[in-house]
Structure formats: C-alpha cells, structure tokens
Design a protein with these regions (language model features):
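Structural alpha-beta junctions
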Residues: 61-69, 146-161, 240-249
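Aromatic/basic-lined ligand-recognition segments
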Residues: 164-255, 261-277
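Internal, hydrophobic cores of structured domains that mediate oligomerization or house catalytic pockets
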Residues: 88-190
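Short, extreme N-terminal segment that most often corresponds to the first beta-strand
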Residues: 14-72, 86, 270-277
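Short acidic, S/G/P-rich loop/turn micro-motifs used as interaction or catalytic elements
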Residues: 49-50, 131-135, 225-227
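N-terminal low-complexity, intrinsically disordered segments
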Residues: 46-117
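Cationic, low-complexity basic patches in intrinsically disordered or flexible, solvent-exposed regions
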Residues: 3
C-alpha cells in the first residue's frame, strides 16, 4: 500500500507524519489535538443569559421533562450551579449576574439559515462536575451531558450551541435533533459533535473525535471523488469508530466505497484511513 502524504500540515512543518512513529506532543498537530475542552457552550444574546434562580425555577417547573435537579447553589452573584442528572454531576457556569463564560474559537457551523455574529453573544457552559471530570470521555457522561444540554437549549432563549471539543457551533434545534436521534440509537452526529476538516488534497481530518474514540482520524482523499462523497464516507467511518471504540492494531473494513485500511499511530492518538490500491 502506497501511503501518500495526506496530512493537513505541510511536509516541512517539523512534524513526523510517519504513522509508525511516536505520537507528537500535544499541540504539535494543529488539527488533530487542538480541541479545547469537554464542555457545551450555550450562547445568548446580550441581556438574555439566565440567572441561577431562573435555572432552578425552570428545572422545578419541568415536571421531569428535564431530568436534572440542583444539588448545590452558591450565592447567585457567583454565577454557577451544580446539577445532578442520571446520577452524574455537572456545573453550569457563566450565569447572570456574573461574567459570561469564554466563548472560544469556532471552526465549523451547522444548522443555521443565517449564523449569528458570535462576538455579539454571551456564553454559559455546561461542564462535567469536578468529581467526574476525569471520566469526561466515558459514554454515560457524554450522553447525559449532551441530553441535558439539548433540553436546556430548547427551554431557554439560546441563540447557538457550541460543542467545545470539536469547536463547532450549531443552531439550537439542529443540536437538539441530532442529539436526540443519537441517544435513541441513531447514527453518531459527526456533523456537530466532531468537526470534519477538508485538506487541499481532498483528505478529511477530524477534530474532537478523540473524546469519543480515543483518537483523531484522517481519511485519505481519492482522485476525482466529489467532496460530498468523501464527506459521506468520513461520516460512516466516524460512526464506526464511535461504536467500535479504540483501535490498537491495523484492520481492514468494508464500506460502500470499497475496502479501507485503518492504521493507528504507535501511540494510538491518530488513526489514518487508507484506500488500498
């Protein structure tokens, strides 16, 4: 198998692109390991961020529709709450009257007819609680966090939702729909909970997949293949990797586009997907 260079980083960037080499240090691979955090950002127009009292009242009035309750409420001017959902604790930060949470960078936007100007919005963050922060990548934590964020996005005047580990921003109803479908057993929502970034050579690299599968993925491009078809294939592979979990040895899989070779890096943090000749 001829392994042509498909990385999005230029060959003279000082990074070793050999899949058999040790993984680069964090920050060396710009696309694969730049994901900033494990929170969900809920963005509001100025003056519309909720207070701790408003969140507590919303949960009390939901009659179980939002499966969460307040377990710790400091003074309201501290601007945060601890919530319990499915036996797991989460923190909601950036509430009024405290300062808004940091918004972060955005690499992809989904679901908007016309996206808002992010610099005009204010964020609150839904984060894994301190007691479970070390397990932020465990499926029960991610699924509960995503479901709770979807409920809040529909019940509050949210203007946009950010999935921090992928640096994506979504229209609230779009976010809620893809999360609900996924939690009901549907395909993993790669267009939102990960970013799929296209290289000049037609390859596609993920950002944020490592939270779900332990590694980022890069799919080799194919000459003459329409970009939409490459994207569909990348979505299939991401769904497979999320369902399969960590891949530690090379393997081949069958797809509608033919057989593919999955080759993990030596450290397991990067997965190359090749198209055997």
């Amino acid at each position: 198998l001829e392994q042509s260079t498909t990385c999005l980083i230029a060959p003279d960037d000082g990074v070793n692109h050999d899949p058999h080499a040790a993984d680069p240090a964090p920050g060396d691979m710009e696309l694969a390991h730049a994901a900033p955090g494990n929170g969900v950002s809920l963005f509001f127009r100025a003056g519309e961020r909720p207070t701790a009292a408003a969140i507590a009242a919303l949960l009390d009035a939901s009659n179980g529709e939002i499966m969460a309750r307040v377990t710790h409420r400091p003074a309201d001017d501290e601007g945060w709450l601890e919530l319990l959902a499915s036996g797991l604790t989460f923190e909601l930060t950036g509430l009024e009257p405290a300062d808004a949470a940091a918004g972060g960078d955005t690499v992809q936007i989904h679901g908007f007819d016309r996206a808002p100007l992010m610099t005009e919005l204010e964020a609150i963050h839904l984060l894994p609680g301190r007691h479970i922060a070390g397990g932020a990548g465990l499926p029960p934590v991610i699924r509960t966090q995503a479901g709770l964020a979807a409920s809040l996005a529909l019940k509050l005047p949210v203007a946009a939702v950010g999935w921090q580990s992928a640096q994506t921003v979504m229209e609230p109803r779009y976010f809620a729909q893809i999360v609900v479908n996924w939690l009901a057993g549907g395909t993993f929502p790669a267009l939102g909970l990960t970013a799929l970034l296209r290289g000049e050579d037609g390859s596609i690299a993920t950002r944020g997949l490592s939270r779900f599968s332990g590694c980022e993925m890069q799919l080799e491009g194919a000459a003459g293949e329409p970009p939409s078809e490459t994207l569909k294939l990348a979505i299939r592979i991401v769904d497979y990797l999320v369902r399969q979990g960590s891949i530690t040895e090379p393997r081949e899989i069958d797809t509608p586009k033919g057989r593919l070779l999955l080759e993990p890096s030596r450290g397991g943090r990067q997965l190359w997907v090749w198209r055997p000749a």
